[in-house]
Curated annotation (Swiss-Prot):
Keyword Methyltransferase on entry: no
Ranges of compositional bias, category Acidic residues: 120-132, 604-614
Gene assigned in the entry: wdr70
Keyword entries, A-Z: Repeat, WD repeat
Protein name: WD repeat-containing protein 70
Residue windows of the WD repeats: 148-187, 195-236, 249-289, 298-337, 344-383, 389-434, 437-476
PROSITE patterns: WD_REPEATS_1, WD_REPEATS_2, WD_REPEATS_REGION
SMART domains: WD40
Residue ranges with Gly residues bias: 539-549
């Protein structure tokens, strides 16, 4: 009975019985079996992939076979493979994904793909084609025009993120453009004149994008924040010191400037005083370092442009004698590399820039040439392009983000055609593309690597932005899609009142009065009758002085110091005693009564006789 009860209870509770020994497992054997299964499965997967690759290599014609025939072949192959696999152990786990089976002939399951959909293989093929032909990567399918002013746009600056553009020109204005905040009207959100009446020559954001370097025609560079408020201003040097290294700042007009690519507080400027100076934003009282370019004879030469290398180790300057001089940033005395005959002497080299790789240097000369140099072999240029007119001392040249193209602008005279933006292949230096910008010179150009957009400054006050909706990012794409904002007019609904104007006192016509009554009324009006002001009684008031003697104190003061002076004639006062002197002589007359009874007076002599009696040496010589 006990065994039957135990068995029934065990069956009810779902286990075999009570008090039996637990089952033991051999873990090593189970691990070995699992490993063998995984190895066999991986072998089968590799064999299947190799077979698919061999089939695809041997029979490329399978792409042209109809899908029905391919489906039949796949069915037969699947049946044969199923028979082969049936002999082996069954696969354990989820089924292999369809993209790993290599069966590209199966029909697509699901809704049809959109018309613009491209497979990843097609995109890779297009990318390879673009790499082979860099012209296809130029974003020039669309453009927007920003109206800076009417004079030349001589400076362009774009922050590293590509959110804000800043432009400067010969009209002394600096304008700020925010792509995210602009609408289709394309209006600048701020305009200012940071350097008063000096032309703006260079604008550049720092590598962090929080401050802007402003270089104008004066001798003091300025640093502004993102909103245009001043942060610092460089000190001016002493122009009476001969050695420019002993002055604290520039003493002549600035020509250019740029930020250090690695150190966010350091920037550089070059000037007509013959120096290239480095500065620190935190110290505006003195420069950080000074570099003095020299001519072949050791004389002072003016640097017209300057730049840092991409790693910030070298400083390059284009000089007015046609030379290009490169210094090590830590050694300011002697040049690291130099080329004396880079451009024609006496011309202004307008731009010096390094490639993104850092080993190629491009220069835009005032002799209408564009040259590339290898700084490791700095004797001769790699390539030269001539016939590129340059009328401005700040005409730009820059590399494309992939270092395959070099772009620059050309200058034209008024009415002489369109200014062009030229694209040159860096390897062959052949002109591969050009853009006709406008009927004015192309001065500034900038190709932003993140936005993949090209900014151009022209000689007629325009700043153009070229972009491609498919290849470009943000930037001009953000503002062209926004509709122009309408001016909001303040409208208020108020209750309408009808007012008769002649009911008001000011519009009411006066009644006709007689002439006598009108004259009497005017007589009572002190203004119309011109009544004089009455004398002031007592102390003065209202700016008028009161009469003297009005009070006891004023009467006493007036009589304290009386004027006792005799205002009579002195001759009459003397002659008053003449009769008494004749009758009763007392002082002088008794002395002459015996010796000279008759009075003898002096003879009156004329002026002419006096001049005649003068000696010769006293006479005036006429």
């Amino acid at each position: 009975m006990d065994e039957n009860e135990d068995s029934s209870i065990a069956a009810t509770m779902g286990f075999s019985g009570f008090g039996k020994k637990a089952r033991t497992f051999d873990l090593e054997a189970m691990f070995e079996q699992t490993r063998r299964t995984a190895v066999e499965r991986s072998k089968k997967t590799l064999e299947a992939r190799e077979k698919e690759e061999q089939i695809s290599n041997k029979s490329p014609v399978m792409k042209d076979v109809p899908s029905s025939s391919r489906q039949k072949n796949t069915d037969t192959s699947s049946s044969s493979s199923g028979s082969e696999d049936s002999s082996d152990d069954e696969l354990i786990g989820p089924p292999v994904p369809s993209n790993l089976t290599g069966d590209h002939g199966d029909e697509l399951i699901g809704p049809p793909l959109p018309s613009g959909y491209k497979d990843s293989d097609d995109e890779d093929e297009e990318q390879h084609e673009d790499d082979d032909n860099p012209v296809k990567g130029i974003p020039d399918s669309h453009e927007i025009t920003l109206q800076h002013g009417t004079k030349t746009v001589s400076a362009l600056g774009l922050d590293p993120s590509g959110a804000r553009l800043v432009t400067g020109g010969f009209d002394y204005d600096v304008r700020f453009w925010d792509f995210a905040g602009m609408d289709a009207s394309l209006q600048a959100f701020r305009s200012l004149q940071p350097c008063e009446c000096h032309q703006i020559k260079s604008l550049q954001y720092s590598n962090t994008g929080d401050v802007i370097l402003v270089v104008a025609g004066n001798s003091q560079a300025k640093v502004l924040d993102r909103d245009g408020f001043p942060v610092m201003e460089c000190v001016k040097g002493d122009q009476y010191i001969v050695d420019m290294a002993n002055t604290k700042g520039h003493t002549a007009m600035l020509n250019g400037g740029c930020w250090h690519p690695k150190i966010k507080e350091e920037f550089m400027t070059c000037s007509n005083d013959g120096t290239v100076r480095t500065w620190d934003v935190s110290n505006e009282k003195k420069h950080k370092g000074v570099f003095k370019p020299r001519s072949m004879q050791g004389k002072r030469v003016i640097p017209t442009c300057c730049t840092y290398s991409r790693d910030g180790k070298f400083i390059a300057a284009g000089c007015q004698d046609g030379s290009i001089q490169i210094w090590d940033r830590n050694m300011s005395v002697h040049t690291k590399f130099h080329c004396r005959q880079a451009h024609t002497p006496g011309t202004d080299t307008s731009c010096v820039t390094f490639s993104y790789a850092g080993n190629i240097l491009a220069t835009r000369g005032g002799d209408d040439t564009l040259k590339t140099w290898d700084i490791r072999k700095f004797k001769n240029p790699l390539n030269v392009a001539s016939g590129l007119a340059n009328y401005f001392p700040m005409t730009d040249c820059c590399f494309s983000p992939d270092d395959k193209l070099l772009i620059t602008g050309t200058s034209v005279k008024r009415g002489g055609g369109d200014g062009k933006l030229m694209f040159f292949d860096v390897g062959t230096f052949q002109k591969v593309y050009e853009i006709q910008v406008t009927e004015a010179s192309v001065v500034r150009c900038l190709w932003h690597p993140k936005l993949n957009q090209i900014m151009v400054g022209t000689g007629n006050g325009l700043a153009k932005v070229y972009y491609d909706p498919n290849r470009s990012q943000r930037g001009a794409k953000l503002c062209v899609v926004k509709t122009q904002r309408k001016a909001r007019q303040a409208e208020t609904l108020t209750q309408d009142y009808i007012i008769t104007p002649h009911a008001l006192p000011m519009f009411r016509e006066p009644r006709q009065r007689s002439t006598r009554k009108q004259l009497e009324k005017d007589r009572l009006d002190p203004v119309k009758s011109h009544k004089p002001e009455p004398p002031v009684a007592g102390p003065g008031r209202g700016g008028r002085v009161g009469t003297h003697g009005g009070t006891l104190s004023s009467f006493i003061v007036k009589n304290i110091a009386l004027d006792k002076t005799d205002d009579s004639n002195p001759r009459e006062a003397i002659l008053r005693h003449a009769k008494d002197a004749e009758k009763n002589p007392y002082w002088v007359a008794p002395a002459y009564s015996k010796t000279q009874p008759n009075t003898v007076f002096a003879e009156v002599e004329s002026d002419e006789e006096e001049t005649d009696n003068e000696p010769e040496w006293k006479k005036r010589k006429i």
